[in-house]
Amino acid sequence: MSRKLIRFDWAMKKLLRHKANFGILEGFLSELLRFDVTIESILESEGNKQDEYDKYNRVDILVKSQNNELMLVEVQNDSEIDYFQRMIFGVSKLVTEYIKEGEPYGTIKKIYSVNIVYFGLGQGKDYVYEYKGEFVGLHEKDILLPTSLQKQDFKVEKVSDIFPKYYILKVNNFNDVAKDTLDEWVYFLKNSEVKDGFKAKGLDKAKEKLRYESLTAEDKKMYDRFQENRRIENSVSYTAKLEEKREIAKSLLQTSLSNAEIAKHTGLTVEQVEQLRSTNE
């Protein structure tokens, strides 16, 4: 029987940094990146230096793999209009931080930016997006490839293998039907639950290690406070959005639009629009 587990973002902040729990994050990254990932160490990341608001809005963890790759995993709960730009900033910062002065550029580490978001980032119906940067010829339409020497020296097959790789998981777009092992992970990220039949790498360890009952008394208090902060933030956000919709609806009441049309434009129910109209008359 499956049971609710603690949220993945809180686990990233408090539990997944311990070596005994590396297997959970290794499993997730292995399923997403489609090759086995072994974590060598957890490095200092921006998410360790957050203000009070960010403690429950955003968390990240920076991983160094045994192949000397950097993997930045970030969870973002609330909407940010410039989130794409922040993804670029985060990766650019890593590029400059992890190359020593005077070192050749060829020593720059491969970087993976994995972004788990719980809001409507951009426009798209999918729930897992992968950025594939290629140099395409404007005239010949061919893809620029590395030379044989570059392939040998840098152990790459494509030029894009050198550049940072971006992934975005729009968790709320997932329909809860797990068709493969990556879907099983997305289901867990969305529902904090591992179903009994799930076989994805790392989820067996998540099911064992991320039980609320396994937390210390102090950690239980911290997690309960985290959950309460999230509920308050969600309530404030919902109220603000509802008020914004009402203001838009009020302005549309001055037009010839019907209640049904105003409801369609604002996301309010017809009953809510009718109530606004009767209040304004």
Regions found by a protein language model. Give the residues of each.
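Conserved single-residue anchors adjacent to enzymatic active/cofactor-binding motifs
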Residues: M1-E218
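Short, charged alpha-helical interaction segments and adjacent helix-coil junctions
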Residues: L70-Q76, N173, D180-E281
